Amino acid sequence: MEVRFYSVGDIDEKAMRYAVIAAQHGGKWIFVKQKARTTWEIPGGRNEQGESIAQTAQRELYEETGALQFVLTEVCDYSVTRGETTYGRLFFADIQQMGPLPESEISEVLLQEELPRELTYPDIQPLLLRRVKETIQEIVEVTEEHVEPWVRMGLKLWPDHSFDEMHKSLLEILHSEKETAFLCRVGQLYAGFIQVSIRVDYVEGSDSSPVGYVEGIYVEESYRMLGIAKKLLARGERWAQARGCVQMGSDIEQHNAASYDFHTSVGFEEANRIICFIKDI
């Protein structure tokens, strides 16, 4: 079996048989279960005679989820080859209002942050959702409305901090001229963040001042390998450049091989290795 993706419009709409709609409501992805099945799937269905593929998506989204108000975005066209090749269009829906589930083949609607384990099409649906995640990413600078997801992710990166400590620290950054953060938003969900600062004291390996500094960077596990960290870093670098910086510093824990590989892959050079000591007195 092979799944391929194309730009919207590359495939003749007359050849399309399916519309698949990756939908979010209340900060969670929506999955549906048909009455005759015990597995979950992304909403979608067959194109009916006389419908455009966008009309198919709108109808299927309502019939399978009860969505009443939503914004529908075309993501891409796709094909699935398994003996024969079938074509469809992938959509993203940001649902603002849901009503009762209409009478249809759907028995249950599930809202959660990630794919269920029991999938109707396990070889196809993870690829479709991944494509949506790659396509609808948006990098935003933090404001007060982002504090809750920022704190939640910050505690995963720095688990030794309490909620109150993290909340206080991040609120201070909101009002700082020397430090800020950027979040990656995927629809209604937040998938990662970078916290950057301007340092005027010596930064290991630098030969300029001031220097931009990565105070922390984190991507939720299920959103890794989607290019999010690189996009966050690029946005942080532009912020530092606008403030007169020509270099960017960072540091990692010595055992963190994945973080080391990321830093070297995006152009950082190792400047030094430092071992820190502490003792109780």
What are these regions (language model features)?
Residues 1-20:
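Acidic, metal-coordinating catalytic segment for phosphate/diphosphate chemistry
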Residues 53-59, 219, 225-238, 265:
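Conserved acetyl-CoA-binding loop-helix of GNAT-fold acetyltransferases
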Residues 230, 242, 254-273:
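Conserved active-site alpha-helix within GNAT-family acetyltransferase domains
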Residues 48-71, 77-131:
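Unchanged
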Residues 24-63:
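Conserved Nudix-box catalytic region and its N-terminal flanking loop in Nudix hydrolases
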Residues 183, 189-198, 213, 218:
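Conserved beta-strand in the GNAT
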Residues 137-150:
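A short beta-loop-alpha structural element at the N-terminal edge
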Residues 240-252:
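Conserved GNAT acetyl-CoA-binding A-motif
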